[in-house]
Amino acid sequence: MPVFQNLRQMPKAVIVDIGGFTADYLQIKHGEVDLSVCDSLENGVILLYNRIRSKASSDLDILLEETDVDAILLQGQGSSYGEEVAALVEYQAQEFVNDMLGALRERQFDLRTGRVIFVGGGACLLRRQIEASGKVAHPVFVEDVNAN
């Protein structure tokens, strides 16, 4: 069943689109969009890339590109970049996700009730970190990055 059909049966849900520059969110109540509850957070994956690249350069004296970060996050700890580099990337990504979810919580979204639908390329990239955070009880991921 498509995600939207499921949303119509839920009292409330929030859609989070993690993009390059921002993470946009929109609340849905009983299948209806609530435009009074939509905004953007300054939590796009480009910020994450920049944090990781800076930390890797200063701490490990290594120059990572965005494609390197993507490869590590999509492969997990068993990447070919080495344990130290992979651990740094994984840690920074988890901190980034925790900050983003904390910002949503500050905006009065209870992520442990209802559904949180993650869309966009950033959501696919950070899926493991979102699931590992323990802050979202029922995450739903839309894998098609063009679906939003």
Residue ranges and their predicted role:
Residues 19, 122-123:
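Short glycine-enriched loops at secondary-structure junctions
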Residues 10-20, 25-30:
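PRPP/pyrophosphate-binding module of the type I phosphoribosyltransferase fold
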Residues 1-13, 32-46, 68-74, 79-116, ...:
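Nucleotide/phosphate-binding catalytic cleft detector across ATP-hydrolyzing
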Residues 24-66:
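Glycine-rich phosphate-binding loop plus the immediately following alpha-helix
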